[in-house]
Design a protein with these regions (language model features):
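Membrane-embedded alpha-helical bundles of multi-pass transporters/translocases
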Residues: 2-268, 272
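Short "domain-exit" segments at the C-terminal end of structured domains
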Residues: 273-277
């Protein structure tokens, strides 16, 4: 059975929401905790790096859990729904840090940021893994994947274009308050978009998934030189994207400087985001 336009649209809406959440964390968490709350750059960077190493083990472990899941609602939708609710709560907590002394804030950031990564993986892995289970048609699977990737880019672009505008509009002179409001808005939109996605998608194709242990996955990876090249390329590409998204705001604030740095930053974002591939 071919997918309907309604299902493809709902899947794309889900991608918009989940990548709005990802982009907000990836692009602004360092700025929020370093420049707004005053933690040291070295500590924030250390936590971000530790989280990426943790993800290397968390992602395949999550894949194993999803593969072993059996429920009346299917294998994937329960994880997408529960992961979305938890991640929305954690995202808000990430950008609504309470007033704490430096040591307590360091602990708070470390715990909440790791939890954000875990809960995001809870919904992201099953979101993409669901594609083969909702249609048997190879063309539909390719189209659904393309819709998801395209709409994910829309979600990222929305965050890049409007976050700092909303921070200023909602928080006034307080960036701390502005980020809290933005996180609340994005969290609510995230839940709504994933509810739309879960309501429209149905697992119509039995997808028996052979599971391997995390140890077996890494063992197979290290024995395959071609897979290592692909993984290495992905790491380099994602590192470049992550560094750019995190540090471009610092370039405008400290290198270009001046009272109008936000206007210059937003001008570039509004020009570049709609034209990127």
């Amino acid at each position: 059975m071919e997918l309907t336009l309604k299902q493809k649209t709902a899947f794309g809406i889900g991608a918009v929401g989940k990548d709005m959440v990802y982009a907000l964390s990836a692009s602004y968490v360092m700025y929020y905790y370093q420049d707004v709350l005053g933690l040291s750059a070295s500590f924030v960077g250390l936590v971000l790096m530790a989280a990426r190493f943790f993800d290397a083990f968390n992602d395949p472990f999550m894949g194993v859990l999803v593969a072993k899941t059996r429920t009346r609602w299917g294998r994937f939708r329960p994880w997408i729904f529960s992961g979305t609710l938890l991640n929305a709560l954690v995202l808000y907590a990430l950008f609504a840090a309470p007033v704490l002394d430096e040591a307590a804030l360091m602990v708070y950031f470390s715990v909440v940021y790791i939890l954000w990564g875990v809960t995001y993986t809870m919904m992201d892995i099953p979101y993409w893994s669901m594609i083969p289970a909702v249609t048997r048609t190879p063309k539909d699977r390719e189209n659904l994947s393309m819709v998801g990737r395209t709409c994910a880019g829309v979600g990222s672009a929305l965050i890049a274009m409007f976050t700092m505008l909303l921070v200023g509009a909602l928080g006034g002179d307080s960036e701390r308050a502005g980020f809290r409001w933005v996180a609340l808005i994005v969290s609510v939109l995230f839940v709504v978009t994933e509810l739309v996605c879960c309501a429209a998608m149905r697992e119509t194709t039995p997808s028996e998934m052979k599971t391997a242990t995390v140890k077996e996955m890494f063992s197979a990876l290290f024995r395959n030189d071609q897979a290592m090249v692909v993984v290495g390329s992905i790491v380099l590409i994602n590192s470049a994207l992550y560094l750019t998204s995190n540090f471009i705001i610092y370039f405008f604030k400290y290198d270009l400087g001046g009272a109008g740095w936000k206007a210059s930053y937003l001008s570039l974002i509004h020009i570049s985001e709609p034209t990127r591939p």
